């Protein structure tokens, strides 16, 4: 049977330093989807890799006294070790220093130049080295890069430019005609309204101020800039521009580019326009997931809150980390990573729910039948609910994954696990065992539990890769295909189960929290000068209100919260750091009235979820006791991040 091809990619990561839990989140999510597609009969190409050129790499290498290639080789080795530790099943790992990629990128650049889409000019602007981005004065936030908040440098140099504006209208039309191209929906509106419709400037696509990059083949004092170099990896990895293009013909266009929302603009504007210019098909979908927030904000060395996935895996195991990232983080929205919540989730979902179901079932089969699986010959009506739920769950899981709703898929599986635990309490095998005449019924109950565990094991295999194998070993089952879940009879009567170790031992929460706290990196000086002068205080509760830290913020976006008449969702700029705030001011202000306003934020209030949305602070307002009106505190157009005293 011919398998349907499926092509999924992660971003290629920038190896300036070791990766953190946020990068791991993207790759684990892509791995889970890739594994699921293989399980359900697809021929999968799962691509990841590293974006290894640029001025920042060159500077870091010079500071270390080594070559840029030596530096990236060292970091890439660590990245591959991390992916091995996380059980990432990529099919290809591309490095932009690979010879085949270098040659293909040079050919792409020349083709675009020869057809008039790239031209030479000179450029003078403000450049952010960490982001490798040029900005105009009006785009800066407090004089700093609007993406990362770091200082920019003036740069003037001869450069090649790509005629982005030539394809802008065509791209707008394409996005409007292909509603699934950019997901989630809110990201699509952001790209259209904030970047495309206001008008695109031509894009600088070469540099002469550094040498660590792919040289322009016909003008070697220029190196090809990150956009054409890095973004082209998605097709060069398949053989585009090379003699053997079988993989390209089979897998392109990509089914999904899975990326963080911070690089969405590059993947939904620059990349599709490049493809249009090359006469190639666009990827079917670009999915921009949210950020992984820690301590109420983005991970940052300046805050000392960067989470090292290696530490977590060494302490708790890869499957525990994978489960938390895939189940607890709302895919497509920002999510909170918290050590305490993580450990408690492992204890409740993995140790209590799944682990206890397996250990209790195996123990009872051994206790009552010496480990031998009995045939289900004595069924009762109470069995039907469990069996029907087991048979319907694979379809729910598949629908969720097709819609890239990974937490929903796991929720469906855990609903089945919970039902199986309840089934034990309902059927009371320990009581059945006391009556010799009910041995046949006891054997049927235990068969149903073993078969349910087989269903669970198959369904969790893309997500909890090691745990699935451990369960299969104890069940002693070889029937682990997705097709086998169409019938509730894959467990073989007469086989013998195998006693094994507890798959998820319970964790001492306080002990492990103390260990993790001791391993936290020390904060380094933040880049934002306003926050250096007035650092944000520690998290507070309402009872500690006298410690409150008030900051000036600018409202960037505002929209109603679904099914909540009083709530608005605001995206605000806190001196280079973006936050989401849920505020009960909908009856007093329309969303469009707030965009561009400067308001005051309670900046160190502990993040909470309101109606399922993360709120990272509280907007300050004044109102009479009868709430007849409400007025936001207006700080004037002070610098964002300024402290209100």
Task: Annotate each PLM feature.
Residues 135, 152:
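Cys/His-rich microdomains that often coordinate metals
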Residues 120, 328, 333, 341-379, ...:
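Helix-rich, typically C-terminal accessory recognition domains appended to large enzymatic cores
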Residues 111, 127, 134, 144, ...:
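The −1 position to Zn-ligating cysteines in a subset of zinc-ribbon hairpins
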Residues 524-645:
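Phosphate-backbone binding interfaces of nucleic-acid-interacting proteins
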Residues 71-127:
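A broadly conserved sequence feature marking short terminus-proximal activation segments
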Residues 471-544:
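Intrinsic disorder at enzyme termini
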Residues 1-48, 100-104, 130, 148, ...:
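Structured secondary-structure scaffolds
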